[in-house]
């Protein structure tokens, strides 16, 4: 049952389209997945295989996004655990398309959990540059970190910070910022009954006030000439056109970049609505409203903002914490000799030397007994709540090195000397913790399904010991 004050407002907002909008709530929610191009250099073969396995149809506004049917259940296929795709609501893919991330940039996903948009950003970055992905709530930040790991991401730093603290540290630091703002969730009413039950006009205003503060912080962190994308999953004007208009009234250095809906494959009638707020910002019609009665997705709003000005030639932004140097090479070689022994025995050096996984030098960071490979141009992490400072390489255990699950998921078969290929049925057994009889050279093996890494195995005495994390095993 939709709240009365919500339906009254929507009737005034939509006019003659209201009945069509209301009827959309009777339709089952649309479901989609987004393929992860970080898993393979050439995605064509595996993409066709996924398309043949599931009944996929292209999401118009997302290059690697596809609708699937409820019967497909891609979340139960081993490909999901291999990070070959991320299951994501189709409308939620639009903001990152609008952000247009580029390889080598510094990008911030400020309100990032559960991680769908962060993983989409890194796909577009092709693993190059720095993504700082942040979530203020600890439990949700943990889920964000887990999804960054599952998707095999190397160039992300996962934080659990407030926007205010980040703004103090990263003044004019990022080339692009995504603010997928916490909101009243009206666009998710069809998908999530709890969002409907918890809704109130007071909560809408509370969310709008919070969004104003988040946007203020984001503005401080964006470089001149940088792009900021603001998005919500609500229909509330106060949180959409209202938040953007309020922000622009205080920030003449920002302007709206009109969204080309036709180029995105979005139907007519999805413009921002100036009449729904007092004192609308110039160009507010150039923002985007995704309506569930007009397209195959839930309700979303997005605005693209540009910060005026240009960076001086050769400009290198510096965080208040400086840059992270990590472990000096001489100490790294001495303290982490077991890791480099593992790397020499396991990696094909010519494939992994570019990623800096084989040789001692700047870029390695130790957190206790855990070793990480930091993203390029990593800021200093002192004073920050860090969940994942980069790619987790592994752990020292009683003078031996044990590789991390995250490392396996970030590798490709061509990166390592030993690969153990499983069928889909064998992969399902591996995910349950099953060991396998095997012959071959003893040591660590990258376990793969359809040439997508799934985890580690260690061969000794004719047995491939299963090193898939016990906490992730499927029964």
Regions found by a protein language model. Give the residues of each.
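Polybasic, low-complexity RNA-engagement segments
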Residues: 1-13, 17-53, 298-301, 308-475
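Conserved SAM-binding loop of SAM-dependent methyltransferases across substrates and taxa
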Residues: 114-127
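Mobile active-site "lid"/loop adjacent to the S-adenosyl-L-methionine
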Residues: 139, 175-216, 233-240, 250, ...
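S-adenosyl-L-methionine
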Residues: 136-171
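A short acidic, Gly/Pro-enriched loop at the edge of an enzyme's catalytic core
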Residues: 102-103, 165-178
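Helix-to-beta-strand junctions that scaffold the AdoMet/dcAdoMet cofactor pocket
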Residues: 126, 222-224
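Conserved class I S-adenosyl-L-methionine
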Residues: 104-113
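Class I S-adenosyl-L-methionine
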Residues: 174, 227-230, 235-366, 370-372
């Amino acid at each position: 049952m939709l709240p009365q004050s919500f339906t009254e407002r929507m009737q005034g907002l939509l006019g003659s389209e209201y009945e069509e909008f209301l009827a959309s709530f009777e339709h089952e929610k649309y479901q989609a997945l987004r393929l992860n191009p970080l898993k393979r250099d050439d995605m064509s073969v595996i993409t066709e295989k996924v398309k043949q396995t599931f009944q996929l149809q292209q999401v118009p506004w997302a290059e690697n996004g596809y609708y699937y049917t409820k019967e497909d259940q891609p979340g139960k296929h081993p490909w999901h655990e291999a990070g070959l795709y991320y299951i994501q609501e189709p409308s939620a893919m639009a903001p990152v398309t609008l952000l247009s991330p580029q390889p080598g940039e510094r990008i911030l996903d400020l309100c990032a959990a559960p991680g769908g948009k962060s993983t989409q950003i890194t796909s577009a970055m092709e693993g190059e540059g720095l993504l700082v992905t942040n979530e203020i709530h600890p439990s949700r930040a943990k889920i964000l970190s887990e999804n960054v790991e599952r998707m095999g991401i190397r160039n992300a730093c996962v934080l659990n910070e407030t926007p205010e603290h980040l703004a103090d540290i990263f003044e004019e630091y990022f080339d692009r910022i995504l603010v997928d703002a916490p909101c009243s969730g009206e666009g998710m009413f069809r998908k999530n009954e709890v969002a409907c039950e918890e809704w109130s006009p007071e909560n809408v205003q509370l969310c709008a006030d919070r969004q104003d503060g988040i946007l203020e912080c984001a503005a401080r962190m964006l470089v001149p000439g940088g792009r900021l994308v603001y998005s919500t999953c609500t229909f509330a004007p106060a949180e959409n056109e209202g938040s953007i208009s309020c922000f622009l009234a205080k920030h003449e250095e920002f302007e709206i970049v009109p969204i080309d809906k036709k180029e995105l494959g979005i139907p007519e009638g999805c413009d921002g609505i100036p009449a729904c707020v007092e004192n609308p910002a110039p160009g507010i019609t150039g923002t985007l409203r995704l309506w569930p009665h007009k397209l195959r997705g839930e309700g979303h709003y997005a605005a693209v903002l540009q910060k005026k000005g240009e960076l001086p030639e050769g400009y290198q932004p510096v965080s208040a914490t400086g840059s992270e140097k990590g472990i000096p090479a001489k100490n790294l070689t001495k303290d982490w000799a077991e890791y480099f022994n593992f790397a020499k025995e396991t990696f094909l050096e010519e494939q992994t030397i570019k990623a800096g996984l084989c040789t001692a030098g700047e870029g390695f960071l130790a957190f206790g007994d855990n070793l990480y490979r930091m993203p390029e141009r990593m800021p200093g992490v002192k004073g920050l709540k860090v969940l994942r400072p980069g790619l987790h390489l592994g752990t020292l255990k009683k003078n031996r090195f044990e590789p991390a699950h995250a490392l396996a998921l970030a590798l490709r078969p061509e990166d390592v000397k030993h690969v153990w290929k499983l069928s889909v049925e064998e992969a399902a057994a591996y995910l349950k913790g099953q060991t396998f009889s095997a012959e071959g050279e003893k040591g660590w093996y990258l376990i793969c399904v359809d040439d997508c890494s799934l985890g580690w195995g260690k061969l000794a005495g004719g047995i491939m010991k299963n090193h898939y994390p016990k906490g992730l095993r499927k029964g």
